[in-house]
Amino acid sequence: MKITVHSSKAVKPEYGACGLAPGCTADVVPLTVLDKANFDTYISVIYAFHAPAPPNAVLEAGLGRALVDYREWAGRLGVDASGGRAILLNDAGARFVEATADVALDSVMPLKPTSEVLSLHPSGDDGPEELMLIQVTRFACGSLVVGFTTQHIVSDGRSTGNFFVAWSQATRGAAIDPVPVHDRASFFHPREPLHVEYEHRGVEFKPCEKAHDVVCGADGDEDEVVVNKVHFSREFISKLKAHASAGAPRPCSTLQCVVAHLWRSMTMARGLDGGETTSVAIAVDGRARMSPQVPDGYTGNVILWARPTTTAGELVTRPVKHAVELISREVARINDGYFKSFIDFANSGAVEKERLVATADAADMVLSPNIEVDSWLRIPFYDMDFGGGRPFFFMPSYLPVEGLLILLPSFLGDGSVDAYVPLFSRDMNTFKNCCYSLD
C-alpha cells in the first residue's frame, strides 16, 4: 500500500457559508483542571467508507462550516492573561491533507494495528501547533479513509467524537446535534469552602521529580511491543457476563466483564509474581455522574480514572467475578463527590506548592504490571455520515504502549466488542491462548 500526499492546507472556519460574523480572534479559553489532568498528547483514529464518497472539496467545505461551531479545533494552545494554559481561538485553522492509495481498500482490509496504518493520518509531530489534523485518502476503488489526529488535552473521546459527527452533519447540510457547549468557565468551580474528601496525590497527581521516570522495554524481538486485535463475539460476551454475574443481584455490564477478563488474561500472559500489585486504570466519564450534569455537547475533558488494585495472585486464582466486583466498586466510587473533591484539591494550591504534575503521562511506554483502559464503547463513531453512508470500519491508530487497552464496538453492529491489546511479543502467545478461556 503506497500512500501519496497531494496537498496539505489549513482550513479555517467559514463564517460566510453559515451566514455568521467572524468570531473574535482575541478570545481565550482557559483549560480546566480536568483538561490539565488529561493526557497532553495527540491521538489518532481511522475511519473507512465505501464508495461513493463526496469529493474532497465538499468535505473541505463541510469542515470549514463545522469549525464555526467548534472553533477550538481551529485554534492553538497558548496562555491566558494569568499565565495559565489556554486555547487561543485565533481561527488559524485545522490541517487538511489530501492523499491517494495505489490499491483497492478491500485488498488491505481489515486494517491491522501495525505501523503501516501511520501513513493514513497526519502525525501530531507534523504540525505541533495545530490541534486537529485530518487526512482524506482515496483508494483505487473509490473508497475513502479519513484519519484524524487530535490533541487530547483539548477534549476527551466523547466530545471529539461529537465533532467528527458534526463535520459529517455540516457536510451534508444537516443541523449539528448535539449543540456544542463551549463555556468551560461555567463548569468545575471549586466549592467554598474547599472540601477535599479523597486522596488525589498518587492518583491524579504525582511529584514532578517522578515525571520523567519512563520505563522502556529492552532491545530485542522478544521485547518489542505488538498490538493484537481481539474480537469478542456477542455469544462470548453473553457467556462471560453469565459467568461473572453468577449469584449477583443484577447482571454485570459488558465493559466491566470485558475489562475484568482482559485484566486477568494480560496478567497471566505477563507471568507476574503472585505477590506483585497490579491495577487497572479505567477512564470514567463524569458527564452524567456530576450534579448538575454536564451537557452531552460539552466540548472539553470530563474524565477521571477508577483504579481497582489487587495482587497478581489474587487476580488470576480467583474467578472473574472477583475482578468484576473490584472494578464495579471502584468505578462507583468515582461519583459527583469524587469529581468535586478532585476539583477542590486541584484549586487548593497544593499542586503548585508541592510541584505536582498529572499522572496521565504520555511518555510512559510500558505500563506493566498495570494496565490502562480507554473504553470507546459509547462514543458515536459509527454515526459519522458525509452523505454516502456510515463508516464500515473504525480503528485506533497503531499505538504500541504496553498495557494500554482500547475497547470499541465492533463494526458488525451486533453488540460484539473489539479490543486492541498491546503486550511484549514474548507474552503475546500466552495471551492468545488464554484470552478466549472462561476458566
Swiss-Prot record:
Tagged with keyword tRNA processing: no
Q: Which residues form the active site?
A: H152, D385
Kindly give the InterPro entries that the UniProt entry links to this protein.
CAT-like_dom_sf (IPR023213), Plant_Fungal_Acyltransferase (IPR050317)
Entry note: thermal dependence: Optimum temperature is 40 degrees Celsius.
Task: Give one Pfam hit by family name.
Answer: Transferase
Coiled-coil intervals in this record?
none
- Catalytic activity entry: 4-coumaroyl-CoA + agmatine = N-(4-guanidinobutyl)-4-hydroxycinnamamide + CoA + H(+)
Q: How does activity depend on pH?
A: Optimum pH is 7.5. Half maximum activity is seen at pH 6.9 and 8.1.
Function of this protein? Involved in the synthesis of hordatines (antifungal hydroxycinnamoylagmatine derivatives). Specific for agmatine as the acyl acceptor, inactive towards tyramine and putrescine. Has activity with the acyl donors 4-coumaroyl-CoA, cinnamoyl-CoA, caffeoyl-CoA, feruloyl-CoA, and to a lesser extent sinapoyl-CoA.
What family, per the record?
Answer: Belongs to the plant acyltransferase family.
**Per its record, how is this protein called by name?**
Agmatine coumaroyltransferase-1
Could you tell me which species this protein originates from?
Hordeum vulgare
